[in-house]
Amino acid sequence: MGYISMSVVAFLVVFASPVVLATDTDPIPENRAQIPQWFKTNVKPYSQRKGTLDPALEAAEAARQIITVNQKGGANFKTLNEAIKSIPTGNKNRVIIKLAPGVYNEKVTIDIARPFITLLGQPGAETVLTYHGTAAQYGTVESATLIVWAEYFQAAHLTIKNTAPMPKPGSQGQALAMRINADKAAFYSCRFHGFQDTLCDDKGNHFFKDCYIEGTYDFIFGRGASLYLNTQLHAVGDGLRVITAQGRQSATEQNGYTFVHCKVTGTGTGIYLGRSWMSHPKVVYAFTEMTSVVNPSGWRENLNRGYDKTVFYGEYKCFGPGSHLEKRVPYTQDIDKNEVTPFLTLGYIKGSTWLLPPPKY
């Protein structure tokens, strides 16, 4: 056998080995300025992730298709519903639906047989999907302007609204902007507007980055396992205001909400970070700015006896006038670095094998 230099061997080993460029163990840094680099390191594009993604996702990304939508014409379709219906059931390719700026007054459902869809708005422009469904008309979770049942969904640079009026106390006024009931979904620079039950983060692993979510009561609810990064949570109006109603129902369920480097704002006072809608909710806020609108007690037991012993409500290194723990309810978890770390990684949403950055417009 001929002589092969060690440098050549090293070269061959590097280029023959699988490239693992995302990790489920690297925590989001405490320094907000380091978020872009953390994201760039851990959420690289498909072209640099071959051999590390879910096989079905990798195959889909290798066969991308683009569909254009413009209400004014000059595109493949004039409505989003027409574009979605054009995608065959059993779809196996990444289909990027590029929406021209404008207001699309449509109620849209992406069914389970159409995975790998991306809804892409133009950065810096206003692309709005809006409808006015209510619980009285459709039932609570079916009232959403956008409902997604299909895996590997993405949305970027979109505003999703439910324009039904703010409900009166005691009325059946739930009106969702979005329901995500599918695994492995990501949202980038999206805005969700509604009042009660704005975002049904219903089921599956989800990632939200650079988003804005607005509502009144339980405006993020469901049983998703979700990581919210650099997202503003804004409560509107006065009276009882609650951000989360996380729906975990047993200690063995692997779901919950984590808010990292987020900001809690509002127009009223006394906002609760969450309430015990179900018996075992799990919600963590880390490195999050809490303005004076946050209720000093922080969390609401919802008059369910015994739930104070089964909830997991954690806060870690939050700041601002609403972040002080002295007056928090006794079941608030003032967690330490070791306890919070699992909530700060992509491992919380099993993200290293499916999470991809948004495509360019």
From Swiss-Prot:
Residues bound to substrate: Q174, R275, W277
EC code: 3.1.1.11
Pathway: Glycan metabolism; pectin degradation; 2-dehydro-3-deoxy-D-gluconate from pectin: step 1/5
Top-level taxon: Eukaryota
Site, as annotated: Transition state stabilizer: Q196
Gene Ontology terms describing biological process: cell wall modification; pectin catabolic process
Alphabetical UniProt keywords: Aspartyl esterase, Cell wall, Cell wall biogenesis/degradation, Hydrolase, Secreted, Signal
Cell compartment(s), UniProt: Secreted, Cell wall
Catalysed reactions, semicolon-separated: [(1->4)-alpha-D-galacturonosyl methyl ester](n) + n H2O = [(1->4)-alpha-D-galacturonosyl](n) + n methanol + n H(+)
Catalytic-site annotation from UniProt: D197, D218
One CC-aspect GO term: extracellular region
One GO MF term attached to the UniProt entry: pectinesterase activity
Tissue: Expressed in flower buds.
Cleaved signal peptide residues: 1-22
Membrane-spanning intervals of the chain: none
Family listed: Belongs to the pectinesterase family.
Protein name, as recorded: Probable pectinesterase 50
Gene: PME50
